[in-house]
Swiss-Prot record:
Keywords: Differentiation, Disease variant, Repeat, Spermatogenesis, TPR repeat. GO terms for biological process: flagellated sperm motility; intraciliary retrograde transport; protein localization to cilium; spermatid development. GO terms for cellular component: cilium; intraciliary transport particle A. This is Tetratricopeptide repeat protein 21A. The keyword Ribonucleoprotein does not apply. The gene is TTC21A. Intraflagellar transport (IFT)-associated protein required for spermatogenesis. Required for sperm flagellar formation and intraflagellar transport. Belongs to the TTC21 family. TPR repeats lie at residues 4-38, 110-143, 146-180, 181-213, 215-247, 334-367, 502-534, 572-605, 728-761, 762-795, 797-828, 837-869, 889-922, 924-956, 957-990, 1028-1061, 1201-1234, 1236-1268, 1270-1303. Pfam families: ARM_TT21, ARM_TT21_2nd, ARM_TT21_4th, ARM_TT21_5th, ARM_TT21_C, ARM_TT21_N. It comes from Homo sapiens. PANTHER family: STI2 PROTEIN-RELATED, TETRATRICOPEPTIDE REPEAT PROTEIN 21A. It is linked to Spermatogenic failure 37: An autosomal recessive infertility disorder characterized by asthenoteratozoospermia. Spermatozoa exhibit multiple morphologic abnormalities, primarily consisting of short or absent flagella, and neck defects at the head-tail junction.
Length: 1320
């Protein structure tokens, strides 16, 4: 018996209830192969045939089983139902069947009653079905299937209270069994109650016991979608198609996913478009093959596609053709005709739509859908009188049927087209929206939801609203238009549910442009991802950049728009935006050329072979273009031509709404001619009632301030504005004006008044706080923030307060404020989560100063919360995806920066790599990673990242510099120098690069090439020699060529600069403490070149220390590293005094730094120098040996070189020349100009009596010291003498005496001996 197969019967009943009539027949046929001649299966097969309108076949099949006791009752009912659906009704047959039905009822069995109830339920007669099932339950209370069926009947009832009772019957029917139909009903019940987790558990029970039961998998897919889990929905859809390749539900859901979530439907060539089209084709094919004669199902399943495809012509064509075929098969189906009318509206073929709506009216004269469609067509075609006449008739009819959102929208649309009252129109639009959304209450996300949502309808309403909204971005402090808020409310559900629909997204971008300019960009970016050729999106993006003053990006965006869609150039707005940007950027001739060209554009022109119309130049746009031309001509100094164009404009637009705007523009022209009084009189004539009064007063105020320098009249203009147009915006203007003339106290009073008028304006609250800060009333600012936060509960102010406290170094209080802001229950809404992330990031900054161990924990919390936001925004606010990804990336960067500061380089690398999961092409992070690899010594990885950067941006300056550093590390000096040279040729005044080049040429032994670059920089501007960066570079160069006094002179000019000052002071201190650039602590040469005048040398040293100490008072550390640098320099000053107490104090300080910063090269070097001065040589050697093992990095190169030289000196004193030579060669490897290394090598060769080698090294020392140290010249001449090279010895002596005439020692000891040796 079929009743023994729970899955089989559940499937048949499910398909019957879902109206899959061909599926019913197929399932019954499969069952009959297993249970041949089963009357129940035969009945359902006949039922499927009957519902496909093959009535005679169905009657024949039903007659064959009507006498079987189990199905006699339902078969007789089905026969009566079938006869009544015949074209020619056989009354006698019906009478006979009705008599037979009465007879059967008298002796009917419980099973017969069950199937009769089942049939009645399936044909929609719920109350009658209940009667039969209840009667059956009285006869046989143990019949579980009857309880299940009773549950299903209640579940599908249109009465909510009845549906809630369904679970009791279902539970009673299921009991401890795995009844598939009962479990399906139970899952459906939980789904209706929006308890999706419970529903999924029940469905999982079915799939465990009946894995091949497809309806359960379909329900599971629908549940995932109801939970808004698109990933699992799609996965389940594909899993169903693996089992049933033409499953209608799976094809439909995958189509919905492609249209609603993936998008890119507008570019015909795109793969995603083909994917969307293929999904639609698959759905149509599945419907035509699996349910070939089921027009109601065809319409039910395809209608969601027409609601989501927008104006996609390919998909519209497919759907139209399919529905037309459906209509041809069943020409009496009125709903198909109205749907075709709707589709032709989408295709912008209004006349075709009108024909189909008229056809629908013929089929159903009382049908509302056909009539509303006809009215819409009349409105769209401009036949407003006809539309109004029909609408009046429809309103009368509708009174008896209740309110309809479509009818109310049509009323609003008609009023809008007839330019009737704004308030009345927007009230009707609001009512239409409320009715529309009320009909969607309780519908889970799914095909029905999208159908009811009807994005096109909401887009139409939004467009009508926008006609009455402001057309300019909101000014600071200005209240957002309530109409814009309403449009956002309308569009939010659409954008949230279907973020791939471009029309709602673009409208939302428009709303944000007018209300929240900063948030419009990310939405538009999404629009352009979906449709790179969208003219409107490109132009709006350009307007945003123009409003932000980012002209470079504005031009780039215009070019990008043209590259994607050449038709952008046909839009007058394109040329107007371009001209405005050119004007702002100062390219007046090009702006004039552009504007003159756009003026010549025809108002309307249809090109042959094109199906689009050129956008017309509207009067307001034409006025804007002419005024922009006047402005460009004025700024270009063509006042006569500007006056002529302005006069033509005044003549053309006199007496129009544009007249006042033109008057204000004329003021600038009059001012250019120096007629200040005329300009002021023109502005005074504009009265408060006129729309441009505010702009006139602002312009007047600027004239008073900038031209007449009258601050009193400047403020009076804004006070008059507040008097005539009171409100938060004008108060804000007055407050800003007072701030601009440095009267923050008065500004505070005005801001406070504005805030009382608009207490929910976040920008106003922040401005008040900032005004207190500007007035240096920090205590009042803190008190204000605290009070405002308590009164209004505005958590965003916590961040402002936290920032202020951090700025004032009140870190404990800042920590307390931010912690309090974070002490709340777990928040679920995105704005609150975003505010928490902001607080956490600020708290991490606070911890950096006094609780470093808590930084990572806090950043982890911020990233976890940001990850939650990123999971939510694609579903709820997809336009925020780019900005939120940017924030997540910035958190990863903060991790990396923290690890970098702590020298945990591997962790820093991983954190930078994590950025790429959010921003795959972030060049800044790529650069940071390359620099980090260089720091770690991973040269190949560094080169790889630099190469990627230079591929994407050939002239990337920093990448070129880094590549140069890398080439240097690889000992490819020429390649490195060439890279620096290329950068400096393009930007000779890039002093940061020049500084790096000086260091590189020094290390390459080519310092003589540097002066040419100084001359190149001077050619850029006469002001270059005054630039701090230039003087800093000159100072460093002089220091390297042994001119300490010149070096100090140039560095002094950079000492006060914010960029170069700290480095300049650092080097000045080093020069003061060691003007001759000796090896600090080195004693190997002490006896050789001792100065005769010890007291004079001591005095000079003391003067140097004193100057260094004065300089250090100007050294203001801005970071932990610069604080450490200051402590080290202070310690070196103490060390330089050579007084034991000072040296011991310095040693203690160095020990503390070395303990706090393990492996710090400067700290270990200073420690070693202190030990040497205190004659603790073994301890010094131990620290220096540690440094000898440290890998060379450019940032620590100077200190490493000093440490190697000092250790070599110690080895030389101990005659360990081999160890010394190894260190000295390392110095020369990394710095070919290290003359001290050559000097020590010469010293070693001399000690070993290898005078020729000694000469070679001293010669290099003499060359690279730039002849600044006579002692080296003396040693070179001495070794020439020892090597019997008397002529060379004499030459060197003469050189030394020429440059150092006060060095007579060389004359007596070498020159005279060499001369004597030359005499015969």
């Amino acid at each position: 018996m079929s009743s023994n197969d729970s899955s089989l019967m559940a499937g048949i009943i499910y398909y019957s209830q879902e109206k899959y009539f061909h599926h019913v027949q197929q399932a019954a046929a499969v069952g009959l192969e297993k249970f041949s001649n089963d009357p129940v299966l035969k009945f359902f097969k006949a039922y499927g045939v009957l519902k496909e309108e093959h009535i005679q076949d169905a009657i024949s099949d039903l007659e064959s089983i009507r006498h079987h006791p189990d199905v006699s009752l339902c078969s007789t009912m089905a026969l009566i139902y079938a006869h009544k659906r015949c074209e020619i009704i056989d009354r006698e047959a019906i009478q006979e069947l009705e008599y037979s039905l009465k007879e059967i009822r008298k002796t009917v069995s419980g099973t017969a009653l069950y199937y009769a109830g089942l049939f009645l339920w399936l044909i929609g007669r719920h109350d009658k079905a209940k009667e039969y099932i209840d009667r059956m339950l009285k006869i046989s209370r143990g019949f579980r299937e009857a309880y299940v069926l009773r549950g299903w009947v209640d579940l599908t009832s249109d009465k909510p209270h009845t549906a809630k009772k369904a679970i009791e019957y279902l539970e009673q029917g299921i009991q401890d069994t795995k009844d598939v139909l009962g479990l399906m009903g139970k899952a459906m019940y939980f789904m209706m109650q929006q308890n999706y987790s419970e529903a999924l558990e029940v469905v999982n029970q079915i799939t465990v016991t009946s894995g091949s039961f497809l309806p359960a998998l379909v329900l599971k897919m629908q549940l995932f979608l109801a939970r808004q889990d698109w990933e699992q929905t799609v996965e389940m859809g594909h899993r169903i198609l693996e089992k049933d390749e033409s499953n209608i539900d799976a094809c439909q859901i995958l189509t919905v996913h492609e249209l609603a979530r993936e998008g890119n439907m507008t570019t015909v060539s795109s793969l995603k478009t083909q994917k969307a089209t293929n999904h639609v084709r698959n759905l149509i094919k599945a419907l035509e093959t699996r349910e070939p004669e089921n027009p109601s199902l065809h319409l039910k399943k395809i209608i969601v596609v027409s609601r989501l495809c927008g104006s996609h012509q390919v998909i519209l064509g497919l759907v139209c053709s399919f529905i037309e075929r459906t209509f041809m098969a069943t020409p009496s189906y009125v709903h198909v005709a109205t749907e075709l009318g709707y589709l032709f509206i989408l295709k912008n073929q209004v006349k075709e739509a009108l024909l189909w709506y008229s056809e629908a009216m013929k089929l159903d004269k009382d049908g509302m859908a056909g009539l509303t469609g006809i009215i819409l067509c009349h409105i769209l075609e401009g036949h407003l009188e006809e539309a109004e006449y029909r609408l009046e008739f429809l309103k009368e009819v509708q009174k008896s049927l209740g309110k309809s959102e479509v009818l109310i929208f049509l009323q609003a649309l008609l009023m809008s087209r007839k330019h009737k009252g704004e308030e009345e129109t927007t009230a009707l639009l609001k009512e239409a929206v409320e009715l529309h959304f009320s009909s969607m209450q309780g519908i889970p996300l799914g095909s029905e939801y999208f159908e009811k949502l009807d994005p096109y309808f909401l887009v139409c309403i939004a467009k009508e609203y926008l006609l009455f909204c402001p057309k300019q971005p909101r000014l600071p402090g200005q209240i957002v238009s309530p109409l814009l808020k309403q449009v956002a409310v309308i569009l939010n559900p659409v954008v949230k549910a279907a973020p791939a629909l471009i029309d709602p997204l673009y409208l939302m971008a428009q709303v944000r442009y007018y209300s929240e300019l900063e948030n419009a960009q990310s939405i538009l970016q999404r629009c352009l991802e979906l449709d790179p050729a969208s003219v409107d999106a490109h132009l709006l993006m350009c307007q945003i950049y123009l409003a932000q003053g980012n002209f470079g990006m504005c031009f780039h965006c215009l070019e990008l728009g043209v590259s994607h869609n050449f038709q952008v150039r046909d839009h007058p707005l394109y040329h107007l935006i371009k001209a405005r940007a050119l004007n702002k950027a100062g390219d007046y001739p090009e702006a004039i050329k552009t504007l003159k060209m756009v003026i010549k554009l025809p108002a309307l022109k249809k090109e042959e072979g094109r199906k689009f119309l050129r956008p017309s130049v509207q009067p307001s746009q034409r006025a804007s273009i002419l005024l922009e031309l006047v402005e460009a001509l004025r700024l270009n100094g063509e006042l006569h031509e500007a006056t002529k164009v302005m006069q033509d404009t005044i003549n053309e637009f006199g007496g129009t709404p544009e007249e006042n705007r033109i008057t204000i523009a004329n003021v600038d022209l009059v001012l250019s001619k120096g007629n200040v009084d005329v300009a002021l009189n023109m502005l005074r004539n504009i009265l408060p009632k006129q729309s441009c009064y505010m702009e006139a007063r602002e312009k007047m105020a600027n004239i008073y301030l900038q031209t007449l320098r009258d601050r009193r009249l400047y403020i009076r203009c804004y006070r008059e504005l507040c008097e005539h147009l009171p409100g938060p915006h004008t108060s804000l203007l007055l407050g800003d004006a007072l701030m601009s003339i440095l009267e923050p106290e008065k500004a505070l009073e005005v801001y406070d008044e504005a805030y009382r008028q608009n207490p929910h304006d976040a920008s106003l609250a922040s401005r008040i706080g900032h005004a207190y800060v500007k007035a240096h009333q920090y205590t009042e600012a803190i008190e204000y923030y605290e009070a405002a936060q308590k009164i209004n509960g505005q958590d965003f102010l916590c961040c402002d307060l936290g920032k202020l406290l951090l700025k004032l170094k009140k870190v404990n209080k800042a920590e307390k404020v931010l912690k309090q802001a974070l002490e709340h229950d777990i928040v679920q809404d995105i704005p609150s989560m975003m505010n928490d992330v902001k607080c956490l990031l600020l708290l991490a900054k606070v911890y950096k100063s006094h609780k470093k161990e808590a930084v990572i924990e806090t950043l982890n919390k911020a990233l976890d919360l940001q990850s939650r936001i990123l999971k939510r925004v694609p579903l709820e606010q997809p336009e925020m995806i780019p900005s939120q990804k940017q924030l997540a990336a910035s958190i990863c960067i903060q991790f990396a920066e923290h690890y970098l500061a702590e020298k945990e380089y591997d962790k820093a690398v991983q954190s930078y790599k994590d950025v790429f999961s959010y921003l795959p092409t972030d060049n800044k992070v790529m650069l940071e990673l390359a620099q980090l690899y260089l720091l770690q010594g991973h040269l190949d990885l560094c080169e790889q990242h630099c190469a990627i950067l230079l591929q994407t941006e050939q002239n990337h300056e920093t990448a070129s510099v880094l590549m140069a550093d890398l080439m240097f590390r690889k000992q490819k000096h020429e390649a490195a120098i060439n890279l620096y040279h290329q950068v400096l040729e393009k930007a000779p005044d890039n002093f940061l690069v020049l500084h790096k080049l000086i260091d590189l040429l020094r290390r390459s032994g080519k310092l003589e090439d540097i002066p040419a670059f100084f001359e190149l920089a001077k050619k850029v501007s006469s002001r270059v020699p005054l630039e701090p960066g230039f003087n800093y570079c000159r100072g460093i160069y002089c220091w390297h060529i042994g001119q300490p006094n010149e070096a100090l002179k140039f560095l002094n000019k950079a000492r006060k600069d914010s960029t170069w000052g700290q480095s300049a002071i650092y080097h000045m201190v080093q020069i003061c403490l060691n003007p001759d650039n000796e090896v600090v602590g080195g004693e190997a040469f002490e006896n050789q070149g001792a100065e005769s005048n010890y007291m004079e040398k001591k005095e000079l040293e003391q003067q140097g220390v004193s100057t260094a100490e004065k300089l250090l008072r100007e050294f203001y550390p801005h970071s932990d590293s610069s604080q450490t640098q200051l402590r080290l320099l202070q310690g070196l000053c103490r060390l330089a005094t050579r007084e034991k107490a000072n040296m011991e104090a310095a040693l203690g300080s160095f020990i503390q730094i070395a303990q706090a910063e393990k492996d710090s090269v400067p700290a270990l070097l200073a420690l070693a120098q202190a030990y040497v001065f205190l004659k603790q040589i073994p301890k010094a050697r131990m620290q220096l040996k540690r440094l000898a093992k440290t890998p060379w990095v450019l940032s620590e190169a100077e200190d490493l070189e000093k440490s190697w030289l000092l250790l070599a000196d110690i080895y030389c004193q101990g005659s360990k020349f081999d160890l010394a030579l190894e260190l000295l060669r390392r110095c020369v490897q990394y710095n070919k100009s290290c003359y001290k290394a050559y000097e020590y090598m010469g010293f070693i060769m001399e000690k070993e009596q290898s005078y020729k080698d000694a000469v070679t090294n001293y010669k290099l020392a003499w060359k690279y010291s730039h002849h600044a140290n006579p002692a080296i010249g003396f040693k070179l001449a001495f070794n020439y003498l020892k090597d019997k090279k008397f002529v060379e010895a004499i030459e060197i002596c003469n050189d030394v005496l020429r440059e150092h005439p006060d060095y007579p020692k060389i004359r007596e000891e070498i020159l005279e001996k060499a001369r004597r040796s030359l005499r015969p």
